[in-house]
Each structure stands twice: as structure tokens, then as C-alpha cells.
């Protein structure tokens, strides 16, 4: 970095910020961004030019991000459609299997699904804090 030509700390800071901004946005976009050279005679105009370049780069990044987000949203919508369709198909298959199964098969299947759950015919009575049933 060549900072000898800059007289004030502000000029050096602007130069460093410019280089950081350009290299940061270049790395994000994967392309080359033209550098703006600062000189002592027109530092005010250079700062405006730098601000404009930074704003343009930020707009470009924003546009790229918006495009990527829209693309991802479309992909996710398609996945949701596919999952809803598959879910409907599985529900139809489940209904068909339930209608074709005998009551004994259904009972056996239900017992295999939830062996640790209590039977629904024995309701649980909540206990009061003192240990007695309410």
C-alpha cells in the first residue's frame, strides 16, 4: 500500500477503505472491479467517486443476492409441492391398507407401533400436590 502521498490520516483511511471495499466486493462477485485512484488535488471528488463505486458495488451485490434468494425460493416451493404430493399418496396407501387389513392385523400393528404407551381405555387421574387424587 502506498500511503506516502496522502497528507492526513483521513485521506489514508479513505484510501484503505476504498481498497478494502473494492477487494471485498470483487471477491464476493468473482470479478474485477476497476480501482479509483486518489490524488491530493481532488480528494473531495475522489471520495464522492469512491462512494459512488461502493454504492454501485453494493447494489450489484444486492441484486445478485435477491436473484439467488428468488431461485432458492422456487427450488423450495417445488420441493414442498413434491412432498405434499408424496404425503397425499402415502395417506391414500395407508387408507387402502387399513381397509384391506383384518381387525386382528390392525390390532397387532397398533401394538407394534406404540408398546410403551398406556392403553387408551384406562384414563389417568392427575394427582394433587399432596399425593391424593383430585
UniProtKB/Swiss-Prot annotation:
PROSITE patterns: TSC22. CDD domains: ZIP_TSC22D3. GO terms for biological process: negative regulation of activation-induced cell death of T cells; regulation of transcription by RNA polymerase II; response to osmotic stress. Residues 108-134 are annotated as: Disordered. One of its GO terms (cellular component) is cytosol. Keywords: Acetylation, Cytoplasm, Nucleus, Phosphoprotein. The modification Phosphoserine is found at residue 102. The modification N-acetylmethionine is found at residue 1. Residues 1-60 are annotated as: AP1-binding. Ubiquitously expressed, including in the fetal brain and liver. Expressed in brain, lung, spleen and skeletal muscle. Lower levels detected in heart and kidney. Not detected in the pancreas. In non-lymphoid tissues, in the absence of inflammation, the major source of constitutive expression is the macrophage lineage. Also expressed in cells from different hemopoietic cell lineages, including bone marrow cells, CD34+ stem cells, mature B- and T-cells, monocytes and granulocytes. Pfam families: TSC22 (PF01166). InterPro entries: TSC22/Bun, TSC22/BUN_CS. Residues 76-97 are annotated as: Leucine-zipper. Induction: Induced in T-lymphocytes by IL2 deprivation. Can form homodimers, however it is likely to function as a monomer. Interacts with NFKB1. Interacts (via N-terminus) with JUN and FOS; these interactions inhibit the binding of active AP1 to its target DNA. Belongs to the TSC-22/Dip/Bun family. Protects T-cells from IL2 deprivation-induced apoptosis through the inhibition of FOXO3A transcriptional activity that leads to the down-regulation of the pro-apoptotic factor BCL2L11. In macrophages, plays a role in the anti-inflammatory and immunosuppressive effects of glucocorticoids and IL10. In T-cells, inhibits anti-CD3-induced NFKB1 nuclear translocation and thereby NFKB1 DNA-binding activities. In vitro, suppresses AP-1 transcription factor complex DNA-binding activities. The leucine-zipper is involved in homodimerization. This is TSC22 domain family protein 3.
Amino acid at each position: 500500500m502506498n500511503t506516502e502521498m496522502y497528507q492526513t490520516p483521513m485521506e489514508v483511511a479513505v484510501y484503505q477503505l476504498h481498497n478494502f471495499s473494492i477487494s471485498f466486493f470483487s471477491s464476493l462477485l468473482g470479478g474485477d472491479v476497476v480501482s479509483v485512484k486518489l490524488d491530493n488535488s481532488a480528494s473531495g471528488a475522489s471520495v464522492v467517486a469512491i462512494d459512488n463505486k461502493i454504492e454501485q458495488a453494493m447494489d450489484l451485490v444486492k441484486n445478485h443476492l435477491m436473484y439467488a434468494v428468488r431461485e432458492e425460493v422456487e427450488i423450495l416451493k417445488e420441493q414442498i409441492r413434491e412432498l405434499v404430493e408424496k404425503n397425499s399418496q402415502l395417506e391414500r396407501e395407508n387408507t387402502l391398507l387399513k381397509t384391506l387389513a383384518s381387525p386382528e392385523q390392525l390390532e397387532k400393528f397398533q401394538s407394534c407401533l406404540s408398546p410403551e404407551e398406556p392403553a387408551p381405555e384406562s384414563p389417568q387421574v392427575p394427582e394433587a400436590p399432596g399425593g391424593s387424587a383430585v
